[in-house]
Amino acid sequence: MVTLAMVTYLDRACIGTMKTTIQAEFGLTEGEFSWVFFSFILAYAMFEIPTARWAEQRGTKNVFSRIVAWWSVFTLVTAASWNYLSLVVTRFLFGAGEAGAFPCMARVMSRWIPFKERGTAKGIFFAGAYASGAITAVVVTALLPFFSWRTILVMFGLVGFVWVIAWHRWYRDDPAQHPAVNRAELDEILADRPPEVAHPRGWAFWSNLLRQRNVRLLCLLYMPNCATFYFCITWLPSYLQNQHGFEKAALGWIASLPLFASIGTQFFGGYISDVLTRKFGVIVGRRTPGIIGYACAAVFIVLASTARDPVMAAVFIALAASTCMLTTAPAWSTCVDIGRENSGTVSAAMNTSGQIAAIAAQPIIGYSLDWFHDWNTPFWFLAGLFVMGALCWAFVDPTKPVMAPAGKVVRTGGTMSSDVAL
């Protein structure tokens, strides 16, 4: 799963570092290029929940293989873009494939990871993703003097097909069916797994899901997380180069600083969530990193907006991003805690709302630069989101499943059902 996270971020993060090169080739303004970023995030938001439900109904193994192959194809197709419109369309189709990656991951972890280790496992997963995102900027910066941006995309696209082959040969949807899993390991996986939950079918399922306060809070609190990540991989290189004059030789490393700093906090956020859960219960374990992480991020991003020294501005942005990412593993662990066998759909709903915030940020940033030449706008936008996220974390209750406990009868459009399977 860590290698999947790395492939995912490799393919999506590279476009930000290539941005100025692609802009020069197609003659695009900042506002126009914002729609390239927008198209990816829009598709990601549109297809995340449908893909999650598809995986819950058809099995994660096959769905995962198909979506990784899909986005790898469109990474290659992006390299063949011949004008602005083709670039926007191919990034949209690429985003449609990547949309299901993390909800599928949540479902895999709900089946394979013991309850007491969920936070740590999520932290390791996202640490790997951010390591890939950070290294991508450095690698692309190093390759651009020798290869065209198109050739680099072809290289990255081929990596996904290697992963699909390995995944399809190794993975099983049920750990009990895997020949390498022994009885002791299976008992550990199943030991603390919460009971399955009964749920209605069809529209009643969605109506019940969206009425849950926990789901609505998760949707709101994940917005700053996604908006921050996309700012780092899309606009940050331009900010550092245009606002503070960093040269291209140093740009890759400086632009990667927030993601490098986030590697440790991604892991630590998950680890400390598990430690606090074992000592004080799951409510304290999930809430604490979320509240502290966002509160610190709000302070650091405001300091970044006021910094005049280029190095200090970069450091404050890195601190804001890294403390923000303390919240990632607890958020995804909470999705599994309350979603159970529907964890893919719950995490998809949360992540989709995050993409909506990131979608809104793209034209806000792009056109504010074109019209006002003002880089403070994204920083204050993020600061407001961080405050909102911290407040939402204070009310999340990971002990309450989104559906009724197993065996409880639920009404589904005039009929009664206690089915658990979809």
Indicate where each model-derived feature is located.
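Extracytoplasmic gate region of multi-pass secondary transporters
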Residues: 15-16, 210-269, 325-328, 332, ...
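Extracellular/periplasmic helix-loop-helix junction of adjacent transmembrane segments
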Residues: 16-46
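Helix-breaking motifs and short loop linkers at transmembrane-helix boundaries and internal kinks
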Residues: 27, 59, 80-86, 97, ...
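Central cavity-lining transmembrane alpha-helices of secondary-active solute carriers
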Residues: 38-53, 256-269
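Conserved MFS/SLC helix-loop-helix module at the cytosolic interface between two early adjacent transmembrane helices
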Residues: 46-85
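Structural signature of the two symmetry-related core transmembrane helices
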Residues: 62-77, 284-302
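Cytoplasmic helix-loop-helix junction between adjacent transmembrane helices
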Residues: 90-127
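Helix-loop-helix hairpin linking two adjacent transmembrane segments in secondary transporters
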Residues: 125, 129-171, 175-178
